[in-house]
Every structure is written in structure tokens, then in C-alpha cells.
Amino acid sequence: MSASTHSHKRKNSHLFPQRKSSNSSMDKPFFPNNDSVANTDPQSNENGHTINEIRPTEATIDVTDVPQTPFLQEQYSMRPRRESFQFNDIENQHHTHSFFSVNKFNRRWGEWSLPEKRSYVLVFTLIALSVLVLLVILIPSKLLPTKITRPKTSAGDSSLGKRSFSIENVLNGDFAIPEDTFHFIDPPQRLLGQDSDPGLYFTTKEIDGHTNFIAKQLFDETFEVNLGGNRFLYEGVEFTVSTVQINYKLDKLIFGTNLESEFRHSSKGFYWIKDLNTGNIEPILPPEKSDDNYELGLSKLSYAHFSPAYNYIYFVYENNLFLQQVNSGVAKKVTEDGSKDIFNAKPDWIYEEEVLASDQAIWWAPDDSKAVFARFNDTSVDDIRLNRYTNMNEAYLSDTKIKYPKPGFQNPQFDLFLVNLQNGIIYSINTGGQKDSILYNGKWISPDTFRFEITDRNSKILDVKVYDIPSSQMLTVRNTNSNLFNGWIEKTKDILSIPPKPELKRMDYGYIDIHADSRGFSHLFYYPTVFAKEPIQLTKGNWEVTGNGIVGYEYETDTIFFTANEIGVMSQHLYSISLTDSTTQNTFQSLQNPSDKYDFYDFELSSSARYAISKKLGPDTPIKVAGPLTRVLNVAEIHDDSILQLTKDEKFKEKIKNYDLPITSYKTMVLDDGVEINYIEIKPANLNPKKKYPILVNIYGGPGSQTFTTKSSLAFEQAVVSGLDVIVLQIEPRGTGGKGWSFRSWAREKLGYWEPRDITEVTKKFIQRNSQHIDESKIAIWGWSYGGFTSLKTVELDNGDTFKYAMAVAPVTNWTLYDSVYTERYMNQPSENHEGYFEVSTIQNFKSFESLKRLFIVHGTFDDNVHIQNTFRLVDQLNLLGLTNYDMHIFPDSDHSIRYHNAQRIVFQKLYYWLRDAFAERFDNTEVLHL
């Protein structure tokens, strides 16, 4: 691997052209002849793939009355378009980074779930250690490399007079950092020249006591368009905006109101179209309005969005897909078979949770000429039933049925359909997959070429298929057998379409993909044509492309921008590579200082890559700025008033001067078998050399996940360190991500085997090397979800030798109870891996829990992800053994995130104070009773 040393060339505009209106390229009517589809004969290509016509019909409508939600929530989506946004507390012109995030399966709920009204997004700071603070006593350690961070101090400052903080400070938002709203508005097509990119974005502003949406430009600071407020009246009823989408011409908006969360990414709500030329706001509705008890004829939709070129609005109602032209106001029904078992353009539970990570299953051609959508058939999938307990108006329990396939049981089946907007015909696409195939991704390479990925049921064999619409040709361009590297197929990152460039004699579309190379590391590969089977590897090395992967592309210089952990496995930086140069040699450029090894950056680029949102997330105070890409690469060196400072951290920096913040070190330990394990050590600011300290081990450990990085944090673990005077270790066992398949593949077919062994060995070695500072009678472990499972498996293995206390939140206790796609991806089916399921990966030695001084178990009753059945089975086994050395807290009607009815605050208070009592030995006199 070599990094090029040439400077990245960029254009500077002296004159900026007037922004032109984007006219639709669509000149044929939507669903011509006023019919849903036209009668055509099926077409067959040379491979025998058949495209069949479907004739949709009209639908009836029903709506559920729900309370209005007068605040905005943050929305995450796999869609390439970014103009749909949700915010916390729309009444303020900025939102707030928060204290807090908790891991769910694959780290996803902390990243993607809809936060509560005052939920703050993780905020945090652990600032570089000042060499002037000589009073700090560090734990001796032979473990290198190490990075230590702590508050910066002035020459006259010391830790005297500073105080510790507790979980209450975290929950009260004492460390919250306000952040201005900033979101790029995507153009209707990729901007190929930087001179045509004004850096159009929207923000919010308080005007006369009301929140207004404002469109602005990074190029022209004087450009400002008021798009209206976040409240409006319809038929005399006031509605408050929860989500907003803005088209590039700034003449149409889509609002979402009254949103009710369903699962991790999905919700239902009312959607509206606003015409900025007239000021009119009308509901987006199916053709037949409902008789809702709002008496307004409104319908709750799963979502509503602009198409990429802004010619259409598409939405899902009652699991059917609808389309309407932006200016027509009349929706057409595309599908007719939507039901509780059939999902059109919308994933079912398992596809939303484990595969697509989105509330949508539709992929638009970039010019709006066509769209492909998926239909999921859950008819044969078994239900789980979740009860609601807290409805005071119900004498009998209400329940919710969710289609939830478990290992070895029936999975949903999928079909793909092509909607041709130019002739109004809908075709079925013969994917060539098997009955139990899984659809992993879809993306248009060009306006006429659709690429998708499918695997076998066990996610071991991947087929990448490309379908060319004009020729009706379908080819499998890549086949990956993960059995060859003892791995599995994971959820994939989006590809980047590369357009033709005649001046370079590039006449065809191609694309950049991210997948493992021959050494097992995830890298960039260039496929020069849509049907190319042999790619050009662009990056190489014992590191991986991480985060969102490709974050931007500059057409003029053929430069690709991506994030990776090349400098350090726990950090992340921005890189670029020239597509032209890299066809002959592997040259990529680090765009940030390589000596800043522990920095963790994330970027979001504008369409032409001229402008960027730069987010430095650690290890120091988080900073978020926006401006020209070349001027926001290093936020520490920004002294330019023209750069937008989005984080407002003045009060935060002033407040933390009053606290002794913990010291964080990033370390590596080599185990007895030669495997290298990364971990984070968090210590109190002022260690007493005469005192022995408890240890809390924090673990997640899910296969392919990377939970512990150099992102800064002032959250639960830091509160434990500061308020309870505890040392925290955060350990990444083998099987986790970021280090290639040689490290990741240890988890295959034996979840819960290597994680507890690595955790136990790291903890023991740490204690041995620092024995003079460690109280070995007070060693605890905790985790949430997969982390709860790992904690319990560690206790089972350790049998009280090292760990004396454990806390498990929403844990899996038996993998036959979890969902099929996630579990079989790593474990195969139970009939194929009996030993793995029933001997290695289940918790079965319940007698080992007798050796604990105390166990704390927490779960929510409405957990649609890890069902409370897992916890009840565990507790039942403890009861059968007569064990009473455990505590349990059940949260009624809370899902996997445990947030319902003030639960999020209470769960962390419970964990914190339970741990306080444990380390104060208040449980030690409790006898373990036996039957």
C-alpha cells in the first residue's frame, strides 16, 4: 500500500451561474391510456428470464386515530436521497447532541431508532491529556499502543476543587451540546461540475416565536428562502411537522405529521404536500379517502417521498404502493394485494431489521423513468404475539401479531417488479433465486440498468445480478462463496455509480463496490462496465473501508472519497483515490494528518463533492462544521468565519471545567494463543495509590460489529467511572469487525464461544498486571442485547472465578428463539449445526450462576427484537435450581430500546445504583437459597 503525495486539485469558482429550474425529462403520461397497465406479451431474454405484466386495481382505505406528536424526530434511511429529515424539539432552531446511546443488536438501535422527544444524541468529550497535570496517578501498564485522553487544563489550573459526576448529570443533559440544523438538499441529478453546485441546504430559524424552515447556500451567504413554519392549519385543525422533504426547485415540500413508530426504521403518519407558490397544503391520500375519526378523511401512510428527480410522489398505504405526479394531485394504485401478509415496496419485520435497514423496498432509476420494488410474502411465516399491558381503558389485554421467522422455520419469500413510468407497464422480474433466497440490496447503475444482490437462506453464497431493461438481459456478474474464507454474507454498503466520461474514452456506466479482497479485508473495487465480471481493485492493505464507505464522488477529477481505518483500527479518517490513476496503480491519499491516529471523522458531501459536512466525533469534544471540502478536513485548524460552526459547545466547555473527567486509553493485548484484542480502558481522573478499585467490563461483541472506537463519550460508563470510582474496560473480542475476515470468522457457527474466553482472559491479565490497584472481589460485567448474551455466557464460562456481578439487559439466552436471518447468517440452521445451537451457543449451565454474588436482569415486555421469552426461560431455570441471588426489572410495553413511559431514564438509574450497591457490598450478606 502506498499513499500518493500529490495535492488534490479542486476548482474555485469566481462567478456562480444562476440556479436553473429542473424541468422533468418525462414527457409521456403516467399510466397512459388512463389504465393501470397496458396489455403486452411477456418478453423473454436469452437466459430465460421472463417479465410478466401485472394489472393493479383500486383499494379501500382505513385510518387509525393517534395522538399528534408536536416534535420532530431524527430519521435514518438507506435511501440515497437525503431531503427527508426529522429533528428533536422542532420548537428550537437547533437540536442537541446527547449524552447517550445504548447498543442493540449490531449496534443498530442506538444508531437508527427514533429518539424520544427530549432524547439527546450521544455527546461526548474526553480531551487530550495535559502534561501539566502531574498529580494524576496512572495505572502501570505494559500494554501498548496507548492513547490517553482527559480534559485540557491551563497552566494555572489543577484538579483541585473539581468534582465527580453521576448518572443523574448524564440523564439531565448536563453534557449536551446544541447543534444547528443543517441538511443538504439533493439536486434532481448528480452535479457533474463544481461550478454548478451552490451547496444548497436547509436549516431552521426562529421568526416571531415560530420555527421556520429556511433554504440557504454555502456559496452565496446572502441567499435565503423562507419555506414556511412547522405548524399549519387544515380544516381548522392544527398540525405540527415531524418530518420535512424539500425539492431542489424550492417550490414543493412534503411534510410528515402525527408519526407513530412501528419498528426500528418504520412508522405511520399523515403526509402532506405544500405548494410554495400558492401556500396550499393538501394531504397525500390514496384515491379513496377514509372515514377517519379525525373527520378529515386522512389516511395514515407508511411513508411518502419525492422520487429522485422530483417528478413523482410515491407512498405506501396498507402495504400497497401508490404513485402520483407531483403536480397532478391524483394518486394511482400500483399494487392491489397488500395485506398483513403481503408487503409491497415496504419490508416486513425481518427485512427491515436484518437486511435492508430501511422502511422502504423500492429503488428508483435516477431519471425517474423506472422503479423496481420488492414484494415480500409472509403467508407461511409464523406470528409472535406481543401484549400491551398499560392501556387503562382495556379490561382485557390487547396483542400485536408480528411475522417473525425463527431458525429452521419458514422465511418470507420475495419478488421484484419493474414499473416503467414511460409506458405505464409493470413487469415481474425473474430473479433466478431459490425459494428461500434473501434479497440483500438493490441499486440502479444507470437509468436502464438495475443491480441487485441475493443469497441463499444461510447467507453463505452471494449472487450479484445485473438486469438491463432495454435488452431484457439478466446476468450474474459475481458469485461469492463465503465458505471459502469461513465467513458469511453481511448487509452490504451502497455501490457508487460511475457515469461515462468521453474525454477519457469511458463510454459506459460502471460502478464502485465494497467487498472483501483475497486477504479478507473490505476494499474498493471498480467495475468499469455494468456487466463487468473482473473488477479493478482500487485499495489494498491490512485495513478496511469503514463507516458509510463511499461518501462522495467528484466527476471533474474522477475522485472517490471514502472513510477507512487505515491509520488505526479503532479510528476513522477520510481518504481519496483518483479513478483514473488507480486503474494502473494502487494510490490513495489520506486527506487528514496521519499523525492524528486516534481521530474519528465522518463526512457527508454535496452532490459534486464541492462542499461537505465534517464531523469530528472523537476522541476530543465533538465538532461539526460545514463548508468547502478542502477547508473542513481538519476541524482543529479552522479559523475561518465563512465556515459554518454547527456545534455550539461554549457552555459545554465551560461546564466541564467543573468536573474531573475520566481518562480514556486505547490499548491492545496479545492473548496466549497469539490473537490480538483491542480494548478501551477508562479510569478515574485521580487514582489513589492506596486504594483498590472495582472493575466493570462493558461488552457487546456481536459478529462483524465494531462497538468500541475512538468516538468520545460521556455516557453511562463514564458516569460509573466518575461517580462510583470504578475502572471500566470495553473489550472487542474475536468475531467482531474492522480487522478482516481472519479475525471475524472466529464467530462462525459458534456464537458465544470465543467472546467469553477473550473477555475473561483480557480481564484476568489486566488484573494481574495491575493487581495493586484492583479489588478482585468487585469485578462486574454488563451488556445490552448481544452484549447481554455475551455477559451471561461469560458468567457461565467463568463460574465465579473472575466475575462476581453481572448485569444483562434484553439478552438472548437461546438462539432458536431469535430471528432466522440474523442467526442463520452465522450459525446456519439448527438441523445443520445441532452442536452449535444446543451445546455451544445456548446458556445451559445455569448452576454456574450460583457462583455470582448477584445478577441483575432487565427486559421490556414489548421487545419485538429479543423477545422477553428469552429472559423468562433463564429465570425459570434459576428458579428450578432454587437460586435467589438475582434481581429482575421488567418494563411494561417497552421495546428493545426500553424507552416507554420514562423507562429510558429509569433503566440507567437502575443499572447505575444497582452497581453502586454491589460494589458497596450490600448484596454480600444475601444467602443463596436452595430448594
Curated annotation (Swiss-Prot):
| Signal peptide bounds | none
Q: Which organism is it from?
A: Saccharomyces cerevisiae (strain ATCC 204508 / S288c)
For this entry, list what GO says about its biological process: peptide pheromone maturation; proteolysis; response to pheromone
User: What is one Pfam family matched by this protein?
Assistant: Peptidase_S9
Q: Which GO terms describe its cellular component?
A: plasma membrane; trans-Golgi network; vacuolar membrane
Protein's name in the database? Dipeptidyl aminopeptidase A
Where do glycans attach? N377, N814
Q: List compositional bias (Polar residues) regions by residue number.
A: 33-50
Q: EC number(s)?
A: 3.4.14.-
User: Topological domains (Lumenal): residue ranges?
Assistant: 141-931
User: What is the organism lineage in this UniProt record?
Assistant: Eukaryota, Fungi, Dikarya, Ascomycota, Saccharomycotina
Gene name of the encoded protein: STE13
